[in-house]
Each structure stands twice: as structure tokens, then as C-alpha cells.
Amino acid sequence: PIVRELTTEQESSVYKKMEQIRTGMGAEVSRLKPEDATDICVETVEEGGESDERRERMRRDEVVLVLDYPDRKNCFQDVKIYARAGESVTVWTVVRSKKDAEGKAVLRTLLQAEENAKIRLVQVDLLGDRMQLFNDIGVESGKQAQIEVVQLFLGAEKIWAGSYATLTGEKSHLQLDVGYYREKQQLLDMNYVAQHIGKKTESNMNVGGVLQDASKKVFRGTIDFPLGCVGAKGDEMEDVLILGEDAINQTVPLILCAEDDVEGNHGASIGRPADEVLFYLASRGLSEEDACNLLARAKLEALCNRIGEQKIAEQAENWLWEVTGDET
């Protein structure tokens, strides 16, 4: 793919059109964007007639974006990912700051995949625990397009996350996997929507994580089947491990259905570790705190293994070990 940094005035018609893609946090987020903002635009390129440099860049189907947010500043970043018909691209986005930094980090990511295109987006949050993160995603898919989104929320004091996937093209597919670790009085508030417009479209949303101490998590997951999306299928699964006595978990699943020939499913596994599991780990010499930390790591390391980029995966795993303490 080609990576460009464009001001609003320099954007092509494709990127300007992408501004109309609906996102999970709504139009209010776009109002936070400064007029002189610089967008990061990732696009696949057409074959034929390119320069040697352009052909060489075409061989790269992976892009790593590391966004460092400064202390005591509020920053907005737009990332736009465009995959032409039949092309594929993987983008890793790491948001990070110094441990003691404070401020607001706003990240909006817009994805558009044309017919038979594939986009894989991996987002890893490594912000300091005094930061606030607004993470917004909008997706639009063409016929038989495939979208995969992997998110891992480990840092920041408060996180508001939204995603809205408009599955327009017939047989297009969305795979969304979210993992999180919340401790102390940290907050994670999520609003995720999969709207099935095209026939035989599919969506899978899997959200799972750990709540320690007095942390709070809210998950609103919506699968929308409007009239005409014949044969569409949407699945939504949540898996929450509650380790804190004062932790608060709120789950608000919603399936909207105006079409008869569709299939929508919601499942949830929410609760504390079973006594027999804690007893077994205690028999192996682990205290209850160490046992809970072990379970927390095990839950999220599986998602770390799916990051697919070694350095980023190592950073996420090191962060996870730091917040859960050393294994004994």
C-alpha cells in the first residue's frame, strides 16, 4: 500500500467521500477535528504503469502506525484505510504516551473495502493511566469484502470506544475481536454496531476482558437486520472475568430485525473465577491474588498472540505482565 499524510485540502475525492462513513461514536467526533489536521491515509495501489518505487511499495501489504500522544495536550488523529477491489492490507496502530502523561487522545479510523478486498486492522492501546482515549471506527464493505478488526485496550484511565460497520456488499464479512484489562477505577465504555445491508452478509463480534478492583465496563452491542438483508447472519459473544469486589459490568445486547430470513445470536459468559479453580491454583502454591493475575494474563495473552507483529505483541505482553505483577 501507499501511505500518505494529507491535509484536509489535499485529500482526494475518495477520502473526502469516506468522511460520510458512519462511525460508532457518531458525527460529534468529527467536530473535534481541527481545521488544519493532517490525516494518515493508507491505500492499496492499482497495478500497471507505476514507477519502480511505486511497484516496490506495492509489495508491502502491511503498515505499522505508532502514534505518540504528548503530555497535557488534546490531540486528534484521523486514519483512513482504503482497499481497492481485490487488494488486501494490514494496518497496525499503536497509541501510546509516557506513563505519567495526561490529556485526551482522539483516534478516528475509517475503513473502506471494495469488492473482494481485505482489510485487517489491529489497534493496541498503551497509553498512560492518566490519559483519556476516544477510539472511533467506521467501516463500509463492498461485495464479498472481508474486514477484520482486533483491538486490545490495556492503558488509559478512561476509554470510550465505538465501531459502526455498514456491510453493504453481498456476502461481505466482519470479524471483530476486542480484549481489555481494567483496574483501579478505570472505565471502558463501548458502543459497537454491525448493520447488515447486503444479502448473505456476516458479522462476528467477540468481546472479552478482565475487570479488577473498582473498574467499570459498559458494552452496547447491536446487530441490525434491516429489510432486504436476506440470508444475513450476525453473532455476538461476550466473555468477562470479574476479579474485583467492586467492579461493575454492564452488558446491553440488542438485535434489531426487520427481515425474516436472517440469523442473529447473542451469548455471554460473565462471572468470577470458580472456587475449584482457585482451590487448584492454591494447591500449587499460588495466593488468591497471584492466581487471579495468572487467569487475567491467560485470558488476554490469547489475543496478544493474534496481533501478528512481533514487536507490538511483545510490547503488549510486557505491559500486561507489568499491570498483573510477576508470576510466582
Feature locations, PLM:
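Short, Gly/Pro- and small/polar-rich lid/capping loops
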Residues: P1-T23
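Conserved beta-strand/loop scaffold segments within soluble protein domains that form the structured core
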Residues: E5, I21-F279, S283-L286, I307, ...
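Extended amphipathic alpha-helical segments enriched in small hydrophobics
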Residues: Y280-A302
